[in-house]
């Protein structure tokens, strides 16, 4: 999903930078409020960011100018919402671009928009829609799966907008189909891993999980 350095036309790189900057700025404000009201949430923030970093660093070759990997953005979306998750993703993506040559600076805005904004936003919507209807473990798994798929759907749209050859729909279908080969199984695996981590953390700090998410231990997240 990480679009590599210099791959996008400059006009599109600027567009994604502007949109992402607005959301990340809002996320920083929310993050400050969370840390002020719940300073004990810092370990969960760190775990959410580290989880995203580790999973999104496991890249596989994919379409030209990009790659495939898990995203790890579902956990943060559940715990802190999509705005704060965009801040975590910005830190992760910037570090990967500077240190691992994974992604790029010119394409950072586009990568933040897909992995840090749209993926978590869709995941959060799935979480809200299923909350109270299914067991929390299933809800977490499905949230992570759809957050991953939404990330790659967004990247497919971004690449198709930048390179609409012969037209947008044909380009989108081509990019999306190639991504689907790896992302369908990867997202399912990511969902399972995220659910296992959720169960472990909720057992470890049930009182903190209940305070942050209003989900009672052992309940159906009602």
From Swiss-Prot:
The record's Gene3D superfamilies line, in alphabetical order, gives: 1.10.1760.20
Transmembrane stretches, start-end:
8-28, 43-63, 75-95, 107-127, 134-154, 178-198
Q: Which residues form a coiled coil?
A: none
> Which cell locations does it reside in?
Cell membrane
Please state the pathway this protein functions in, per its UniProt record: Cofactor biosynthesis; adenosylcobalamin biosynthesis
Q: Which UniProt keywords apply?
A: Cell membrane, Cobalamin biosynthesis, Cobalt, Cobalt transport, Ion transport, Membrane, Transmembrane, Transmembrane helix, Transport
- Record GO terms (molecular function): cobalt ion transmembrane transporter activity
| InterPro entries from the UniProt entry | CbiM, CbiM/NikMN
Q: Which GO CC terms are listed, alphabetically?
A: ATP-binding cassette (ABC) transporter complex
Highest taxon, organism lineage: Archaea
- Example of a GO biological process term: cobalamin biosynthetic process
According to Swiss-Prot or TrEMBL, what is its membrane topology? Multi-pass membrane protein
- Biological role: Part of the energy-coupling factor (ECF) transporter complex CbiMNOQ involved in cobalt import.
Family of the protein in this entry: Belongs to the CbiM family.
Database matches in HAMAP family = CbiM
Under PANTHER family, the record lists:
COBALT TRANSPORT PROTEIN CBIM, PTHR43627
Q: How does it assemble?
A: Forms an energy-coupling factor (ECF) transporter complex composed of an ATP-binding protein (A component, CbiO), a transmembrane protein (T component, CbiQ) and 2 possible substrate-capture proteins (S components, CbiM and CbiN) of unknown stoichimetry.
Please give the name of this protein. Putative cobalt transport protein CbiM
Its lineage opens with:
Archaea, Methanobacteriati, Methanobacteriota, Methanomada group, Methanococci
């Amino acid at each position: 999903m990480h679009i590599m350095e210099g791959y996008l036309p400059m006009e599109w790189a600027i567009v994604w930078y502007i949109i992402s900057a607005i959301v990340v700025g809002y996320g920083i404000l929310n993050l400050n409020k969370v840390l002020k009201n719940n300073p004990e949430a810092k370990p969960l923030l760190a775990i959410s960011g580290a989880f995203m970093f580790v999973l999104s660093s496991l890249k596989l070759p994919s379409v030209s100018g990009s790659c495939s990997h898990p995203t790890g953005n579902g956990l943060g979306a559940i715990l802190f919402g999509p705005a704060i998750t965009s801040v975590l993703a910005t830190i992760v993506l910037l570090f990967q671009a500077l240190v691992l040559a994974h992604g790029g600076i010119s394409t950072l805005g586009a990568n933040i928009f897909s992995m840090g904004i749209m993926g978590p936003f869709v995941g959060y919507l799935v979480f809200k829609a299923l909350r109270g209807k299914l067991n929390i473990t299933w809800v977490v798994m499905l949230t992570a799966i759809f957050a991953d798929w939404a990330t790659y759907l967004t990247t497919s749209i971004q690449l198709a907008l930048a390179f609409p050859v012969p037209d947008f729909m044909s380009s989108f279908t081509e990019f999306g189909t190639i991504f689907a080969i790896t992302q369908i199984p990867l997202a399912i695996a990511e969902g399972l891993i995220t659910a296992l981590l959720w169960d472990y953390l909720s057992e470890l700090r049930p009182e903190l999980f209940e305070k942050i998410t209003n989900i009672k231990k052992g309940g159906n997240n009602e």
